[in-house]
Amino acid sequence: MRSIAAPAAVAAALIIVTLCTGTAAQAQTADKPQTQSKPAAKPSAKPKPQAKPVAQPKQTAASQADSRPSICVASTIGRQFHVQTIGIMVFGNSLEKIPIDSWGVDDLAIRKIQDVVGRNYAVRRLPVSASALTLLEPKPFSGWTQDPMHDFVAAVAGSGPRCTTYMTVTPSGSQVDGTNQAVAGLGILVQGSPVVLIDRTRVFASFILRAFDGETFKPLHSEKPTTDPLLVNALTGGLSAMNRNVDKTWVPNPPQSAAQSAQLRNATRALVEEGVAKATRAILEGP
């Protein structure tokens, strides 16, 4: 019995060891991670976008102006406003000159020229020095000399590049009908009347536009704008200038207060704007 039981016990022990070993091996196999497949190849890099074509610079207003005919303008009408009275007798005459640079009349005149000629022309303002202004002052007759406007245009043109055309906007005298008096530039006029004993009051803008050749400064054309035709002025006692009738309450008192008057400023600017447009169109149309 003891000999049979011993081999049987040994066999049973071997079976148990075998079973345990197999179970452990299975467990180790399960614990091992499965072999990973090779990682997929990375997608090829995206093709670099083609460089955008360099945008051509747009033509600026300045470059456009370089290719256009140029009109250079010197305006001197916006410096003073006259408060003027013409009495029945010479002792009733008076004239006060008031600075009005703040009204911007010269800039207005040049903008209006640009409006009329359109974008086909490049218009720019020429500065006017004090020495150039003296060339416009009346001088005693000294024989046949060169037109003073030639010297004035040459002075304001300077030594820089020449313009195609030069234009000037300057005060011009206008005879007051029925008197030996005249007005010039911008102002308000009170005119005594011996017939009906009623004073006539007018705001006026008496000026002239002239055009000159850009190389020789030779005069090309000139226009003096008026509100009414010359024949109408002669028949009605009007002014050969831009003007409008106003109430006598418009007369500034004291005269120095004219520069602060909005109604005088606005009325004057309107006359200048209308007159410059008339004269510029006439110059463009030619003689």
Language-model segment annotations:
Residues V83-T179, D199-T226:
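N-terminal segment of the mature soluble domain
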Residues A8-I15:
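Sec-dependent N-terminal signal peptides
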Residues Q28-G118:
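General N-terminal leader/first-domain-start detector
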Residues M1-A5:
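Positively charged n-region of N-terminal signal peptides that target proteins for export
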Residues Q28-K32, K46, A51-P69, I77-R79, ...:
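C-terminal/domain-edge helix-coil "capping" segments
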Residues I15-Q26:
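C-terminal segment of classical bacterial N-terminal signal peptides
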Residues V83-W103, I188-P194, M242-A258:
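A solvent-exposed, charged loop/short amphipathic helix patch at secondary-structure junctions
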Residues N180-G185, T236:
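Outer-membrane beta-barrel translocator domains and adjoining extracellular loop/strand segments
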